[in-house]
Amino acid sequence: MSTKFIFVTGGVVSSLGKGIAAASLAAILEARGLNVTILKLDPYINVDPGTMSPIQHGEVYVTEDGAETDLDLGHYERFIRTKMTSRNNFTQGRVYKDVLHRERRGEYLGATIQVIPHITNDIKQRVYSGAEGYDIALVEIGGTVGDIESQPFLEAIRQMGTEIGRERALFIHLTLVPFLGPAGEVKTKPTQHSVKELRSIGIQPDILICRSDRKLPSNERAKIALFTNVEEKAVISLPDVDSIYKIPALLKSQDLDYFVCRRFHLDVPEADLVEWEQVLYQESNPTGEVTIGMVGKYIELPDAYKSVNEALKHAGLKNRLTVNIQYIDSQDLETKGVDSLAHLDAILVPGGFGGRGVEGKILAAKYARENKVPYLGICLGMQVALIEYARNVAGLVDANSTEFNAQSASPVVGLITEWLDAEGKVEQRDEKSDLGGTMRLGAQKCHLTPGSKVHAVYGSDEIVERHRHRYEVNNNFVEQLEKAGLSFTGLSEDKKLVEIIENKDHPWFIAAQFHPEFTSTPRDGHPLFEGFVAAAHIHQKASS
């Protein structure tokens, strides 16, 4: 059948949870047997989020095909089985860049390039292309209705609604209905004005999802329906909940999926949410708890480590444990010492870039090694564990990464200096190269050493994990580090690059160059995080 489109916009304020709402609806539709995908359209001018500050933008989520994308794509993959690709996320900057590139090549035959039709046509083509082959495509428009940056995207989806007709296009508007304490009531006026703004550009929402800190009374839903020209049963109340994984059931209880299927004339089975019921059961019935310290430098914005946070929670579900995450600024370890690590059941050092706070991360790895505390290093977290071991065990006292000290006499971690590009040509990469689009990215195979801890964790000889990094373990130091007792138990497909290290004299000390957090889901978990949380619980019991 022809793809049906559900366009999701937001109003009043940003960060209302459009991505979670879209992903939750997608999960219900998928549970009805439909083939579903989700696209995210970002209005900012950056070509992609790859070089944006994690403190401003949150984490950069990496897809299987190596696209650096918005963190909402992580939500999408955690809620539905469909794997996201580079087609599932694009920015206004990417659109303008490509349109201007075609203009320079003369592809517009000298025409004056305008937002309408050239920019909007490019947006529409990307949406159609990204949705191809699916029963339903949800399209989330970043930002808020009324933002200048969002106007080309809103115009594009307005045109799409006209082109494909009401039987294939449905508009959902997510809005805020605040509760005013002194007045003792919810206020619908912001929602009314937000819908008025949306209608002024030619889009009439079919469904309103109203965010509030409480369930909306039926009389307020009726009032909103009256003033926004939306069916009363299509005004959905979405109150705050203590777990985002409750939202699919919450939306289903208000027949949101039924409304969508009726609108699209879809005769499909009822949604079976038994997998989500199992997730909620595991979440609400823990048998214990562990405290894991996450040592990083972007801790003022937890969304900078969004997928790691979620992966730890998923591992807690599989172990029937509540995972309490304590964020520790790595710079504090440099200035105040490591006493803040003493009460932890495990230590995790996630990825990152730049030299700020690196010595604190090295101290965290040293503390975990010396005190037999379970340690999981991810990307930079592996590199600092390697540097620490080289300095304090292998005798390479000046060991470092060339990212932090280009003149190090023992550069145990170094820049990727050449590889093949997509056309099979050799490219040179050094410290003078552009930062954007110059990394080892996406899903790659890794061979595991039989008999190693990580082999036992995965239960497989070969795995596929996603990468996002420029620097690698320097193979010139591998033999010396192995003689000092460090184990290199995961190698790239061609056996030339180190992917995983282990400390064989430690109960659980594993560090990986890749990012396992990107493939963890609440329904399936991830073996590396599950093993890590289980080790934290064992350490807790042994220490008590």
Curated annotation (Swiss-Prot):
Positions contributing to UTP binding: S14, K187, T188, K189, P190, T191, Q192, K223
Pathway note: Pyrimidine metabolism; CTP biosynthesis via de novo pathway; CTP from UDP: step 2/2
Residue numbers binding L-glutamine: G352, L380, G381, M382, Q383, E403, R470
Regulation of its activity: Allosterically activated by GTP, when glutamine is the substrate; GTP has no effect on the reaction when ammonia is the substrate. The allosteric effector GTP functions by stabilizing the protein conformation that binds the tetrahedral intermediate(s) formed during glutamine hydrolysis. Inhibited by the product CTP, via allosteric rather than competitive inhibition.
Enzyme Commission number(s): 6.3.4.2
Occurrences of domain Glutamine amidotransferase type-1 (ranges): 291-542
Active site: C379, H515, E517
Region annotation Amidoligase domain: where it falls in the sequence: 1-266
Leftover remarks: CTPSs have evolved a hybrid strategy for distinguishing between UTP and CTP. The overlapping regions of the product feedback inhibitory and substrate sites recognize a common feature in both compounds, the triphosphate moiety. To differentiate isosteric substrate and product pyrimidine rings, an additional pocket far from the expected kinase/ligase catalytic site, specifically recognizes the cytosine and ribose portions of the product inhibitor.
Role: Catalyzes the ATP-dependent amination of UTP to CTP with either L-glutamine or ammonia as the source of nitrogen. Regulates intracellular CTP levels through interactions with the four ribonucleotide triphosphates.
Subunit comment: Homotetramer.
Protein name as catalogued: CTP synthase
Organism from which the protein derives: Pseudoalteromonas translucida (strain TAC 125)
High-level lineage: Bacteria, Pseudomonadati, Pseudomonadota, Gammaproteobacteria, Alteromonadales
